Amino acid sequence: MKLAMRRASTFALLALSWSAAVSAASSAGDYFVRSLPGAPPGPLVKMHAGHIEVSPEKNGNLFFWHFQNKHIANRQRTVIWLNGGPGCSSEDGALMEVGPYRLKDDHTLVPNEGSWHEFANLMFVDNPVGTGFSYVNTDSYVTELDEMADQFVIFLEKFFELFPEYSQDDIYIAGESFAGQHIPYIAKHILDRNKNSMTKIKWNLKGLLIGNGWIAPNEQYRAYLDFSYSKGLLDKNSETAKTLEAQHKDCAKEWEDNGPKVDVAKCESVLQTLLKLSSKVEADGKRHCVNMYDVRLRDTYPSCGMNWPPDLVNVTPYLRRKDVVEALHVNPNKATGWTECTGAVGQSFKAQKSKPSIDLLPKILEEVPILLFSGAEDLICNHIGTEAFIGKMTWNGGKGFEVTPGTWAPRRDWTFEGKDAGFWQEARNLTYVLFKDSSHMVPFDFPRRSRDMLDRFMGVDISSIGGNPTDSRLDGEKLPETTVGGAAGNSTSKQEEEKKKLDEAKWYAYRKSGEVVLVIVAVAAVAWGWYVWRDRRRRRGYQGIFGGSPSESTTRLPGLGSRISSTPSGLEGFRSKRQNGRDVEAGDFDESELDDLHTQTPTDARYSVGADSDDEEDASGSRKEGGPSGGRGR
């Protein structure tokens, strides 16, 4: 009995050590991107990428791609970027909008001169689970906004555990389109978390930026028609207009009968009908319609913008390359390649029990500044709808952009490097920026202008680091200097000191991860040695008393002369694990390689990412034309 208890305690200790080793395998070093296929010559932007588990019971993991800032201006900042959909990958933002690189073709990256990582760490997250490189069991897609926000906070908790050097940064959450629902909900959950007395480390949420956001559905649904009239897409006296106005009345009635919703089916059909009835057969014999993301452009019906932007033809094949997937630490058992927008996620995420995010904005504005920006040529989440809900909303003691009763904050004309860029308007913690001649994806059209906007909103001060400031003016008045396009200097002692602190924190995190694994390995080795010693001693004792031989139910371990159970254990998996062809248990590795340990979990081979949405794409990875409602979404 005592022998059995000793064996049980021994294997329990070994199992505990193995379990700890598995959990410790995810360290900052595991996420480090050592090289990126197609990257331009010169130093690679420091980056990390991979999955973080947010719902173990549903096998839900969020994928992130993090880029370290180029320069530190007066304080550390982190910008988190989310695309919309719902179900559209934030790698759109990484490779077509605000990330450090753009694709010249499907295998060549070039620098993005307007990248948002100039003065801020920049992280893209495929959100919610099932989107892009993120994954979850196919029957467990997120359906409500609070559930999404809960998972995102879990993601941030684990991210900051892995990278504690970023946990006290000023945090900004940015994105576009349907992220106008995600971002306010995430912000609310962060603010609630910070108010919890049990929270040890508060996160410094400093601002939200939402571009062409789907925030106030009621105003946006009505704006489909108002925007079309203003742009000459629709004749107010036409039969088409009468049909659409009747549809909108049905939409308004459903809204009134059922209360505010994020998504109303009868209202969604207004845009689809508008695109269909305004389409025409043109000289090439094909039916063409307006591009709903940029009304200056045309597209074949029923795509109506889903073939845009042009960079998309390079992004999809690039993110499906085996070497790129490996470089970004995407799970190799992924059942499908990267998809820009996962239809199954969008179909599940109806948020029928969630209030539209506009209901959250007034309370958030009491604590956090918000910047809303719009591209003037976007139809699907157009600026008329955004301006309408701002005008109706009451926050911080006033309605709309009132500065005094009856007096509104002026729209200040914005010029960028001598060109008309749009206007700015702000009051009581809310800023609104209209980008002239821009589409649904503002940073795609104007990356440098968009970063100028970001830097001003964050209060970037380049006086300590130098650099060439851009000429950006409001009503002719030159604004505080920020650099756009030119590299900032890095010459002051203050800058070097801040960088040194950051590096020290980072390497401390890496060392800590390595030390934990070494301790676990040492404990396991001692426990195993003790067990072997006790087993040999006991076996010798049995032979001396009985003259017998070891039991047939056990096997001899070659080279040790000891016995182990013939039933495989967790230790067996650890013992056979090899790194670069070398035996990990034998110690044939250096300390830095501990960061590269990865253990396959039981779930590795059984998850699927949007497997039921693969029918949206053809063999080349391009989206099939399934009508306006079956494509990118918002």
Swiss-Prot record:
The keyword ATP-binding does not apply. Glycans are attached at residues 429, 490. It catalyses: Preferential release of a C-terminal arginine or lysine residue. It is a single-pass type I membrane protein. The chain crosses the membrane at residues 513-533. Its main location: Golgi. Residues 25-512 are lumenal. Its EC number is 3.4.16.6. The keyword Transmembrane applies. It comes from the Eukaryota. Protease with a carboxypeptidase B-like function involved in the C-terminal processing of the lysine and arginine residues from protein precursors. Promotes cell fusion and is involved in the programmed cell death. Belongs to the peptidase S10 family. This is Pheromone-processing carboxypeptidase KEX1. The lineage of its organism: Eukaryota, Fungi, Dikarya, Ascomycota, Pezizomycotina.
